[in-house]
UniProtKB/Swiss-Prot annotation:
Gene name tied to this protein: araC
An individual GO BP term: arabinose catabolic process
Name of the protein in its database record: Arabinose operon regulatory protein
SUPFAM superfamilies: Homeodomain-like, Regulatory protein AraC
Domain HTH araC/xylS-type span(s) in chain numbering: 180-279
Role played: Transcription factor that regulates the expression of several genes involved in the transport and metabolism of L-arabinose.
InterPro entries noted in UniProt: AraC-bd, Homeodomain-like_sf, HTH-like, HTH_AraC, HTH_AraC-typ_CS, Tscrpt_reg_AraC-type_HTH
Parts forming coiled coils: none
GO CC, one annotated term: cytoplasm
Keyword Zinc: no
Quaternary state and interactors: Homodimer.
Species this chain originates from: Salmonella typhimurium (strain LT2 / SGSC1412 / ATCC 700720)
A GO term for molecular function: sequence-specific DNA binding
Length: 281
């Protein structure tokens, strides 16, 4: 029987956790000076922040050189083929492997450098803050206290939100707090099979018609369409990262009838739930 690998910096580590974080200090000709090669990617996401030196990311013939301050996001299934740039003497990068909470999906849609590999570079003034958050996530994630993992996940959520705040600050006016609260309420009640707009409107102290108008004005989509997108996104996440029965996945996103869930899922994704899950394995 093969020996279990307990070092996440070395090949063979299972990453069978909600969050694993660390620092990979690659020096030329050192014991970590090899290329990570995962052609099928991983089941979770990986965030990667370069802090020293240069790394090179390869993807089907394309290449990207990452430098200090660059943050990359590898989603589930994305090719992982990266290592120290041959012209650099070192590549130090911090990383966080995680399985996201359902309502994070919007925050994980990043501009890409190629394929599905996301990219974000904070401006010079903000880089120290993002670097500090990364360090706090790693410190919490490697802790052994009862709440260490939960603290790390919450710090990661803060990092993702701070990136969203930076992007929105430069591209969009602030979202109406009532629309934001409505989105949060909907995300928190995806399993409610008796959902209606009136309950959301009541929660944010608006009439259903006013909420519908504001929602479409700010997000460019109806309340029901946005909820449907969130349900399908959550279903895809559960299908790809758990062995939960399909009927249970459906109930988790508000479908009491498995056949109806399968029809809606296939209409939205082009594949049945079982076909989608098989494609993720």
């Amino acid at each position: 029987m093969a020996e279990t690998q307990n070092d996440p910096l070395l090949p063979g580590y299972s990453f069978n956790a909600h969050l694993v974080a660390g620092l990979t200090p690659i020096e030329a000709n050192g014991y970590l000076d090899f290329f990570i090669d995962r052609p099928l990617g991983m089941k979770g996401y990986i965030l990667n922040l370069t802090i020293r030196g240069e790394g090179v990311i390869n993807n089907n013939g394309e290449q990207f050189v990452c430098r200090p301050g660059d943050i990359l996001l590898f989603p589930p299934g994305e090719i992982h083929h990266y290592g120290r740039h041959p012209d650099a003497s070192e590549w130090y990068h911090q990383w966080v492997y995680f399985r996201p909470r359902a309502y994070w999906q919007e925050w994980l849609t990043w501009p890409t450098i190629f394929a599905q590999t996301g990219f974000f570079r904070p401006d010079e003034a903000r880089q120290p803050h993002f670097s500090e958050l990364f360090g706090q996530i790693i410190s919490a994630g490697q802790g052994e206290g009862r709440y260490s993992e939960l603290l790390a996940i919450n710090l990661l959520e803060q990092l993702l939100l701070r990136r969203m705040a930076v992007i929105n600050e430069s591209l969009h006016p602030p979202m109406d707090s009532r629309v934001r609260d409505a989105c949060q309420y909907i995300s928190d009640h995806l399993a409610d099979s008796h959902f209606d707009i009136a309950s959301v409107a009541q929660h944010v102290c608006l009439s259903p018609s006013r909420l519908s108008h504001l929602f479409r004005q700010q997000l460019g989509i109806s309340v029901l369409s946005w909820r449907e997108d969130q349900r399908i996104s959550q279903a895809k996440l559960l299908l790809s990262t758990t062995r939960m029965p399909i009927a249970t996945v459906g109930r988790n996103v508000g479908f009491d009838d498995q056949l109806y869930f399968s029809r809606v899922f296939k209409k939205c994704t082009g594949a049945s739930p079982s076909e989608f899950r098989a494609g993720c394995e």
